[in-house]
Each structure stands twice: as structure tokens, then as C-alpha cells.
Amino acid sequence: MEFLGTTQTASFCGPKKGCGLQALPPAGQEPVVQECYQPFHLPGYRYLNAWRPSVFHKIATSQTIPEECSGIRRPPTILPSLRSALFCRYTPRDWDRSNDLQIRNAEASRLWASRLTGDSLRIMQDKDQLIHQMQEGTSRNLGQRLSDLGFWKSELCYELDRLLTENSSMDTLKRRLECAAEEVNCPLQVALECLYNREKRIGIDLVHDNVEKNLIREVDLLKCCQDQMRKLAKRIDFQIRDNRDAQHSLERDIEDKSSAQYIDENCFNLRSTSDSISFFHGVEKFDGTVSIPETWAKFSNDNIRHAQNMRANSIRLREEAEHLFETLSDQMWKQFTNTNLAFNARISEETDVKNKLQTQLAKILQEIFQAENTIMLLERAIVAKEYPLKMAQTMLACRTRRPNVELCRDVPQFRLVNEVFTIDDTLQTLKLRLRETQDTLQLLVMTKSRLEHELAIKANTLCIDKDKCMSMRKSFPSTPRLTGYTCSAIGSGPYANHAPRISSGPCSGSALCKGPASCGGGASCGGGASCGGHAPCGSALCSHSVSRSGPGFAPVC
């Protein structure tokens, strides 16, 4: 039954679409005769606006009744106040359906609660097992970490002990070098000629390399044995500083590892029942680490390698000093050997660079060939694309002569315009790529020219070092021990710090050289010089007048 003033949210006020029920009646209940309930509406009633006055909104609508309910007589259209009885709101079937629905909902809720309880118990067991496994894994990882810490700490301590021993040896050697003073003399004519030839190098190859340093060291007679010892002592002092720096790095690393080992041991011994545990909220969100296991191990390994390199350098310096302490001939042979080794290394470097330049030149030539082919293909492609553009533009031009309304912007017109724009854009792209390829070709040509120039420079340098210098140095005395001059006066007096001046030509002054050959700094001054004839001719202690000759390398006595 329909009441005035009720809203459409009530379940008994809505229209029912059908009378047939899909659900079967409960067991043991007599079948109920199907009936169709159609709510009664007063004239002027609006279904969606039941709260509005119906007298202002009269709509001529017809109540649609399903076919199965067409046999049911519609209640007479009378006012509710004139009715003798009211219609019931629900049917017995609705009541049974509601009860069944409540029972099913209760059963579903019970099943859901039972399932949720089982799942919760299973989740708790799984999480307990997971946490236990994670704790075991963490303890195992901490144990492995402690093992790694112990290993690296022992390695660092071992290397530190060896480095301390090496530092002590270096300090002793430094004191020995500061007290030693010897002078050596070696033949210089070959080294001077090598320097003169190496001045003919061109461009960037005119570099002050290791060969140049060794040759100058030979020309200057290593200045003097005392300066040589002082330089070596200075190098040893620098090496001692490097060793101490490596020592401090090892000590700092050992100290850090000791602290980390103490902390990790405390963490390893913690248990869930320990008294020292507490909450630290947000600690897992803050990542204050500065390394990973690989970089952590590499840091200690680098410190050990650095200390080993420092010890190796110290050993080389001590060996060099021990050789320097032997004899003048040994020192001269060593210098000659070092110079030859520097020559061989430099020749190897020059050959390697020359081969690399030749390889690059071959690649550049190949790229030039490819660039030229690309330019040719691009030009052909541009020419080939011009014909479709001409055809499309011709078709557009012809279509512009259509009369009157036939001049329509139809699909062919759009396609032709699009085709023209596309082909034109393609042509612009190809032309741009053509210009870029041409620029690249110019760059490749310039690179080819530079490489050819560099190859010429390298060939000239290789010819000087290998064919001229090394061929002359083959005639250098090969005996490991050569006699020389030792002057006890060198190292004291006003000429102690002066570089020796070596002759490169025949004697032309008043000095009496012992022989017709070039003085070369190896002949003794036999004239009335202040040195008394004991100093090398042309040296700092020789008082004879000198004159410049040659390319400016050394004076002539």
C-alpha cells in the first residue's frame, strides 16, 4: 500500500518488477500462490519526487503492469481515508526470504571468522619461524664479519711490522748517506752527442723525458758524488715520509677495525633476553654507511698494497744506495745501464705510439672512404626524392585549376599536401645530414693531415734515438768497473755547489790535455791552472778561460 508523505527509500514503497520468485520455498511448507503486488499511486503522483506536492506536478503516466500480473484486479482509485482496509507491507515469502538471508549471513560471518582465526594462527607461526631464521642468519653473518675483521686486522698488523722494520732501515741509510761523500767520473762524449742529436727532435717530441734526464746526469757527472748522495738522501727522506704516511694509514685502519670488532662482538653476543636491548625508532630508515663489503675489503687491500709498494720503493732506494757505496766504476756502469734502459723504454714507447698512429691513420682513411660513399649516396637520395616532390606539387597545382565548387578540400587534397610536407621534410633532413657528413669529411681530412705530421715527427724521433744514439752507445765501454778521478777537495770550498762544465770539442785554450782527442771532461788539466792539474779539464775547479761552442751544451776548454 502507498502512503502519502513517505520517501522512496522504504523497501515497501518501490515498484516491483516481477512477481516470479527464483528461490524455492522452504521445505515442508505449502506452496504459496504467486501474486503480483503493484503499489497504488494517486493521480498526479511522481515516483522520483514523492516529497513534492503532487497537485503542482501532474503527469499523465500509465502504470505498467507485467504480463503475469495482468489478471490481478487493480485496487480502485479512491482516497486512503475512504478505504475499508489497508494492504500489508510484506508477503510471507518476503519474510521467509529475509530469515534465510539472515541465517546465511550469520553462517558466512562465522565461516569468515573461523578462517580468519586459522589464518592468523598460521601467520603468527610463519612470522615466528621467519624471525628466528633471520636472527640465525644475522648471527651467522656477524660471525663471518668478525672472521673477516680478524683476517684483515692480522694482515694489517703483519704489514705494519714489516713497514716499521723498513722505516728503521731507511733511517739508518739516510744517516749513512749524509755522512758519505764520493766523487765519480764517467765518459761524456757519447752522452753529449746523444743530447745534441736529441735536440733535433721536432714538435711535441722535444720533451724532457727520462732519457733526457739520464743523459744530463751523465753530462754533468752527476754534479758530484756529494750532491748525488744528498739527492739520494732527499729521495730517501721523501720515501720515509711516504712510508710514515702508509704507516699512519695502516695504524688508523687497525684502530678502526679494532673498534668495529669490539662493536660487532657485542652485537654478536646480544640475545632477545639481554638487558641492554631497547627500541631505537627510525634507526632502520637512516642509512649512515659509507662503504659496501667490496669497497671495505678494497680499502684495507689498498692500504696493504700501498704499504707494500712503499716497502718496494724503499728496497729499491736502499739497493741503489748500496750500489752507490761500492765503487766509481760500478756507479758509472749503473748510470750507463739506466740510460740505456731509459732509451729502450723510450724507443719502445715511440714504436708503440707510431704503430698506434698508423693504425688510427688507416682507420681515418677508411672513414674518409665511408664518408665519401655516404655523401654520394645522400646526393643520390636527394635527387631521387626530388621527383616525387615535383610530381606531388604538380598534382596539387593541377588540382587548383578545378572549377567552382569542385575546388574541394577532399581526401586526395589532404594526402597530397601531407605528401608534399613529408617529402620536403625528408629532403631537408637528407640535406642536413649531407652537410654534417661533409663537415665530418673535412674533419677527417684535417685529422689525417695531423696524423701524417705526427707520424713524420715520430719517425724522426725514432731514427734519432734508435739509429743514431743507440748505435753510438753500443761502443760505450762495457766493463762494469772503470777507473776515474776522485778529488777530496770537491764538496768543500766556493765551488762545492757549482755544476761541472764539460767540454764537447778539442782543446783550444792554454790547458795541456793528455792526448790529441777531445777533452770531454775526461782529460786532466796539465797547465798552470789553480786546480794543479788534478781537476777535469773544463770543470768548475779549472781556472782556464773557456769559450762557448756547439749548440750551447758545454764550453770548450
Swiss-Prot record:
Q: In which tissues is it expressed?
A: Strongly expressed in germ cells of the testis (at protein level). Expressed in spermatozoa. Also detected in brain.
Coiled coil located at which positions?
302-386
What happens in the null mutant?
Answer: Male mice are fertile but show lower fraction of motile sperm cells due to a significant proportion of cells with deformed flagella.
A cellular component term (GO) from this record?
A: sperm flagellum
sequence repeats, residue ranges = 507-512, 513-518, 519-524, 525-530, 531-536, 537-541
Keyword match Coiled coil: yes
Q: Is Ubl conjugation given among the entry's keywords?
A: yes
Q: How is it modified after translation?
A: Ubiquitinated, leading to its degradation. Deubiquitinated by USP16, promoting its stability.
Superkingdom of the source species = Eukaryota
Q: Where is this region: 6 X 6 AA approximate tandem repeats of C-[GSK]-G-[GSPH]-A-[SLP]?
A: 507-541
Check the record and name the Pfam families matching this protein. Answer: Tektin (PF03148)
Q: Which keywords does this chain's UniProt record carry? A: Cell projection, Cilium, Coiled coil, Cytoplasm, Cytoskeleton, Flagellum, Repeat, Ubl conjugation
> Where found?
Cytoplasm, Cytoskeleton, Flagellum axoneme
* One of the GO biological process terms: flagellated sperm motility
**InterPro entries assigned to the protein according to its UniProt record, in alphabetical order:** Tektin-like (IPR048256), Tektins (IPR000435)
Purpose of the protein:
Sperm-specific microtubule inner protein (MIP) part of the dynein-decorated doublet microtubules (DMTs) in flagellar axoneme. Forms an extensive interaction network in different conformations that reinforces the helix bundle composed by other tektin proteins (TEKT1 to TEKT4) and MIPs to anchor the tektin bundle onto the tubulin wall of A-tubule of the sperm flagellum.
| Quaternary assembly | Microtubule inner protein component of sperm flagellar doublet microtubules. Interacts with TEKT3.
Would you identify the family this protein belongs to, as annotated? Belongs to the tektin family.
Report what the protein is called.
Answer: Tektin-5
From what organism does this protein derive? Mus musculus (Mouse)
Lineage start:
Eukaryota, Metazoa, Chordata, Craniata, Vertebrata
